[in-house]
Structures are given as structure tokens and as C-alpha cells.
């Protein structure tokens, strides 16, 4: 049950999970929804209408998949197919919509997931077009492993392999000094993530259903966000 999270600095892991819930559970593009969770990491991209445009949760919430004669969104379709058609090679979600890229405040960094069920285990491969190694990468790698655990739990599978692919990993010049400090720090054993085993519906998870056990980490390091 080890979780891939940085130990050389403190990661705001609850903030990361709240952002995950905002995108995947609420399927929201409304920054005000995130603000209600006391999270402000998207404030810089907030548009006049309070949203980030047609990005992230907006794409997951579009009812563009057909299921039993009805239109459903990507998340509901994925959950249904994993339970009812586990051997499919089409367990994919996609945030990269070429028709709507110009309507997004920020084009998605993590844009695709592909899920595999083998021998009773749920495997996940994530694809990111771009990852800021100081800020975005630690959040994203942790978040999508949490997502894998959540979906494995509600679909009845054991946890399988987790693969995170990055097209362009980059370091901004202004982050170099603090990253050098971070690289010299002691690393600690990975903590364990507890997820409330009573939750059986993906939409019932709340932030209170997650606990990091024995999370030892270095001091906080500040990195400027690029807008």
C-alpha cells in the first residue's frame, strides 16, 4: 500500500486529492467549486465566468458515450465497462479535445488514462504531454495513483501496476536553486495510503476518506507557479 509521494519536501496531499475530486468526481471546471474546498491552485487561470473554460472536468462531464441506449460521460462509462467488460482494450479517458482547445484556459497536461484488467488486478497507464518537475509532476503522480486505488476499490479489483508517461518533462530556471536543495535532502520510506474501505460508490468519496500513514518528509520548499 505504499504510495508514490515525495518525501524530500512536504506535499500538500489533501490539496492534490481535492483537485482530483474536483476534476474526476464533480467533473467541474468551476474554480469556485474548488475554492469552496479551500483550494486556490487554479485561481490564476480563473476566467470572468469563474471557470477554466472547457478544460479538465468539463471534458469528463460531457455526455458523449452511449450506454444502454443513453448518453453518459467518460467517468460513468469507464466505471461501467471496468465492471461489466473487463477484458476490453478500450478503457480510455481523454481530456485532449482538439475542437475545444482554444476554449480552455489551459490545455491539459495530463490528458489520457488507459486502464487494463488482468488476473483480477486493475492496471493504469497515464499520459502527460507536459510536466513541470518541481510542482506539477509530484501532484500528478500522486493524484492518479490515488485515482487508481479509488476505482480499483469500487470496481472490486486488486491494485495493479501504475505507469506514468511524460512527453516533455521540464524544469524552469527559477526552480533550479530549490530543486538542488531538494535533491540533497534525505529521503524517507514511502508512507501508506488508507482509503475508507466502506466506500463502494465512486461518488461517495470525500476528503475524510483518505489518510496518509507515517508520512515523513523534509521541510516545505516554495516554487513559483508559472502562469
From Swiss-Prot:
Binding sites annotated in the UniProt record for (6R)-5,10-methylene-5,6,7,8-tetrahydrofolate: 132
Active site residues per record: 109
Protein name as catalogued: Thymidylate synthase
Keyword Lipoprotein among UniProt keywords: no
Gene Ontology molecular functions: thymidylate synthase activity
Involved pathway(s): Pyrimidine metabolism; dTTP biosynthesis
Binding site for dUMP: 89-90, 129-132, 140, 170-172
Cellular compartment(s): Cytoplasm
Domain of life: Bacteria
Amino acid at each position: 500500500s505504499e504510495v508514490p509521494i515525495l518525501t524530500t519536501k512536504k506535499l500538500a496531499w489533501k490539496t492534490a486529492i481535492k483537485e482530483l475530486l474536483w476534476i474526476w468526481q464533480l467533473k467541474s471546471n468551476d474554480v469556485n467549486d474548488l475554492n469552496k474546498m479551500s483550494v486556490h491552485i487554479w485561481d490564476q487561470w480563473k476566467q470572468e465566468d469563474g471557470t477554466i473554460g472547457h478544460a479538465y472536468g468539463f471534458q469528463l462531464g460531457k455526455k458523449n458515450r452511449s450506454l444502454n441506449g443513453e448518453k453518459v460521460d467518460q467517468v460513468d462509462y469507464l466505471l461501467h465497462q471496468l465492471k461489466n467488460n473487463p477484458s476490453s482494450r478500450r478503457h480510455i479517458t481523454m481530456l485532449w479535445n482538439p475542437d475545444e482547445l482554444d476554449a480552455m484556459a489551459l490545455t491539459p497536461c495530463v490528458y489520457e488514462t488507459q486502464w487494463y484488467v488482468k488476473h483480477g488486478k486493475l492496471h493504469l497507464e497515464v499520459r502527460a504531454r507536459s510536466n513541470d518537475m518541481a510542482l506539477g509532476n509530484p501532484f500528478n503522480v500522486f493524484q492518479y495513483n490515488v485515482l487508481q486505488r479509488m476505482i480499483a476499490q469500487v470496481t472490486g479489483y486488486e491494485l495493479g501496476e501504475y505507469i506514468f508517461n511524460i512527453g516533455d518533462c521540464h524544469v524552469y530556471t527559477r526552480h533550479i536553486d530549490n530543486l538542488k536543495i531538494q535533491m540533497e535532502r534525505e529521503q524517507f520510506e514511502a508512507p501508506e495510503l488508507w482509503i475508507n474501505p466502506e466506500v463502494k460508490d465512486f461518488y461517495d468519496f470525500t476528503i475524510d476518506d483518505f489518510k496518509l500513514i507515517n508520512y515523513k518528509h523534509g521541510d516545505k520548499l516554495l516554487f513559483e507557479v508559472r502562469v
